[in-house]
C-alpha cells in the first residue's frame, strides 16, 4: 500500500492465495486493488509517461488453477474493473513540465467485467512427488499457453463487450554464470469488438 500526500489518496494491492490440493497444484486466489493503468502499453517513452496515457483503475479478481495431468494446467479468472480518468490528479510540477501537451484524457467512468479461461502445457515437466505435495523442478521445453477472454456486458454495471484469443510460448533457461534468462513469444487478436474502450485494445 502507498499513500500520496499531494492528492491525499491511497493506492495498492491486496491478494490471498490458497493451495487446496498440493498434489494437483490446485489453487484459488483472490485480489483487489487500486492503481494506475496505461491507455497504451506500447507507446514511446515520451508518450508512455505522459499524463494523457494514464487512467485510474480499481479492481477485484478471482482465479482458479489446477493441473489435469503432468505439465497440463487449466485456469479460469473473473475480474471486475472500474476505470476513470485522472480528473484533477496532481503530478509533480517538474514531472509535468517535462512533457508537452501534458493534459489528462477525459472520458466517462466505466466498469469492465471480463472472464477468462485457458490451458497451458509444458512437455516433459520434471517433478518430485512428495507424500503430501508435488514439487515442480522444470523442463527443457517451453510452456505453451492458450487463453480465451470475454467481456460480459450487463453484469455488475459492465458495458464493454468483446472477445479475445491469445497464444503464447514462454521459457526460462540458465545461462551459466550469468544466471537465468527468459523469452516470451505471443500473438492474439479480437474475435469480436462490439464495444471497446481505447484501453481495451
Model regions and ranges:
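Residues on the lipid-exposed face of transmembrane beta-strands in outer-membrane beta-barrel proteins
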Residues: 1-3, 14-20, 32, 62-66, ...
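Structural signature of outer-membrane beta-barrel domains
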Residues: 4-8, 21, 33-39, 71, ...
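Residues that define the transmembrane beta-barrel architecture of outer-membrane proteins
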Residues: 8-12, 54-60, 109-115, 161-165
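Repeated loop/turn-to-beta-strand initiation elements of outer-membrane beta-barrel proteins
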Residues: 9, 22-28, 70-74, 84, ...
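Surface-exposed loop/turn segments flanking beta-strands in extracellular/periplasmic regions
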Residues: 23-24, 88-104
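Outer-membrane beta-barrel architecture
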Residues: 25-29, 71-75, 112-116, 136-145, ...
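C-terminal outer-membrane beta-barrel translocator/porin domains of Gram-negative envelope proteins
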Residues: 27-37, 41-53, 105, 147-201
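Outer-membrane beta-barrel transmembrane strands
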Residues: 47-86, 109, 128-137
